[in-house]
Amino acid sequence: MLKSYYGNPTKDMKLVAITGTTGKVAVAHYVHEILKASGEQVAVLASDQPFKMGMLHKFLSDAWKAGANVVIVTVPAGSLRENVFYGLPITVAAMTNFTTASLSDMTPEEYLECEKTLFDMKPEMVVLNHDDVNYETFAAFKGTKKTLDYGQTGSFVKVLNSKLYPRGTEATMSVGGEIISEATFMPGEMAVSYMACASAIAAALGVVSEHIVDGIAEYMPEE
């Protein structure tokens, strides 16, 4: 019914879906800024809280009407449990991490089962955190076109070194074999992982390194 009401806007847009227990919102905003820097017409729906199917489809419809050609959406496990994303064509599905300490409303087993539903939707490209302790579990998830990884142990995006400051973070990474230096106003070690994830997503979408660096620098996290 929602599809008949809102139409099928995703047929004209690339859909980037970002999931994981932490960092979804930060990565979504990083990717949003990167794609804006590259000249794409992009819209973002980012929240750690689950949202309803009606809200998602209205967002997609509004983004399409506004001329977006890429949409970025965070994917809480609770929304996957309610089949909110059922039937949507996913261009990129990315996993930030799986931290059991962050789970409050489901068991680790239930969470993994929810996450599996996203990657079972046959996304064109899958981006995974090679540093995550549960990487071997998620390594079974494959994109129909390509599967990429990131992290200090990553092969596609490899974190070479980083510097942490009270009000920001710098990192040097190899992205598809090209060495780039990134800087963000987000402090903390996790910022390095989130930048790496966003860089992998952007590179998967064909964004050049200059725009990745510019977009990362543009994101201003809330205090």
Regions found by a protein language model. Give the residues of each.
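Phosphate-binding loop of NTP-binding sites
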Residues: 2-130, 134-145, 202-205
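Adenine nucleotide phosphate-binding catalytic loops in nucleotide-utilizing enzymes
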Residues: 105-112, 116, 144-223
